[in-house]
Amino acid sequence: MAYKFAKRMNNIKASEIRELLKLTQRPEVISFAGGLPAPELFPVQEVKEVAAEVIEEQGTNALQYAPTEGYDPLREKIAKRMEKFGVNVTKNNILMLSGGQQGLDFSGKIFLDKGDVVLCESPTYLGAINAFKAYEPNFVEIPTDDNGMIIEELEKIIETTDKVKLIYVIPDFQNPSGRTWSVERRKKLVEVANKHDIVIVEDNPYGELRFEGELPPAIKHFDTEGRVVYLGSFSKTFCPGFRLGWACADEKLLNKYILVKQGADLQTNTTAQMILNKFLDKYDLDEHIEKIKEVYKKRRDLMINTMKEAFPKEVKFTYPEGGLFTWAILPEHINARKLAEKAIENNVAFVPGGSFFPNGGNENTMRLNYSNMTEDRIVEGIKRLGKAIKEMM
């Protein structure tokens, strides 16, 4: 049959990461490709316990439809947790999402018409690129350094670019670079957005996974005009399979997200929300996060130290203070996609960095995940990857 697809489908491509993950299902593959949490850290017994209690106590309520906004006790707890990022809100500023990724799709649907401009970090999250592409915007990449987006460059581009509708950023342990914005850059970003009347989407799934240093305030902390939409997630701090995230925004703006969610999936999973809420009642999530951070810090250190030994000195890489990823820049003559093909032949996988640049280029970069593999596999995988790089030098 000749299906008559909408023209927008021409802009929607398979995620390179999702396709790569299919290859990594083989047990012999050492995968640094996905942004996967360590499954051995999932609180399986605790979830089993509280899930039974939820069904026992809530009965049919846990299995029924619920309000689009989400389960009120959980929304209240999230509003309280936002205080650690310097954001003072109530449950009325919180909308439960089916994962933080849903908030990206909703942001595109709410703000973007064909030809509108999205300003983003260079590089930026592949999942956001794919979510926004369905709405046919133009992407303009803003240069970054170790302190985040270079605000002077941002303002120059805003002043010479028409139809800027959205600034999309990941200020904490950015995916893919692992970098974190300075407090000064966060403050200045809001000042620029206020001056030019532009909405900011702040995506922060990794912010609580800080291994060292002080927790900086969210960009939302500096928002005095209600123009910052903050997207949070429990996928990296609890369990990704529950698909639980949230949007935090000014009530007038959040109402648009509620309307869009009603048309998308009516509501976020009731049972999952109640299980998480019960978990938060009975257990200390911050204590659980400390255990995650301890393991990830050890794995980050091991990966970085092994890279220093196994990679040619010409390869540069970031040293993230938290999160899940480090970012490597190869000599310009090495194509990371070709390196990935060579690596997979040796049962090692990573994501070529070119996928994280919406306008292409930068084919000599790669993203490496350190959270998912055990220590021995990290060492062996980096050694294999280093050998493959040396063969291409």
Model-derived regions, located:
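N-terminal small-domain helix-loop-helix segment of the aminotransferase-like
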Residues: 10-99, 106, 281-282, 287, ...
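Conserved C-terminal alpha-helix-loop-beta "cap" of PLP-dependent enzymes
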Residues: 253, 328-367, 380
